[in-house]
Design a protein with these regions (language model features):
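Domain-level recognition of nuclease-like catalytic cores that cleave nucleotide substrates
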Residues: 94-126
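Acidic-basic catalytic patches of nuclease active cores, encompassing PD-(D/E)XK
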Residues: 1-37
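Solvent-exposed beta-strand sheet faces enriched in polar/charged residues
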Residues: 38, 62, 104-106
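Short, charged, amphipathic alpha-helix that recurs within catalytic cores of restriction-modification
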Residues: 75-94
């Protein structure tokens, strides 16, 4: 997934930013084009906006230092899902995009070596 600086647990902001960079790299490796990051909407932020083929993906990135509080995917609950859908609608209204929009979650868990174990889930809410 590319070289990242060795990370330690206990620095959530740094860990989250590194996770978003790692997620963008993973998505590029899997054929997605990252077209936006950090879109601020009234109901929250879209971590990554990607395109693959004729589909736009709204990607939530969840980075964890361990699994003591559940998996990264489990952290995307009903409230976050509603916020993502509302932010996606706002993004569509402000952009020229008229094609299909789908959702994805990239879950990253910090490893003992300072890298990440990564999991990409498309359509996690279906």
């Amino acid at each position: 997934m590319g070289a990242l600086p060795r990370l330690r647990a206990g620095r959530p902001h740094e860990l989250g930013r590194a996770g978003e960079r790692a997620a963008a790299g993973l998505l590029r490796e899997r054929g997605y084009e990252v077209v936006g990051a950090g879109f601020l909407a009234r109901r929250g932020e879209l971590d990554l906006v990607c395109r693959r083929g004729d589909t736009l993906f709204i990607v939530e990135v969840k980075t964890r230092s361990g699994d003591a509080f559940g998996t990264p995917l489990e952290a995307v609950g009903p409230r976050k899902r509603l916020a993502m859908r509302a932010a996606a609608a706002e993004y569509r209204a402000l952009s020229e995009w008229r094609g299909p929009i789908r959702f994805a979650v990239v879950g990253l868990t910090l490893t003992a070596e300072g890298g990440f174990d990564a999991e990409l889930t498309e359509d996690p809410f279906d």
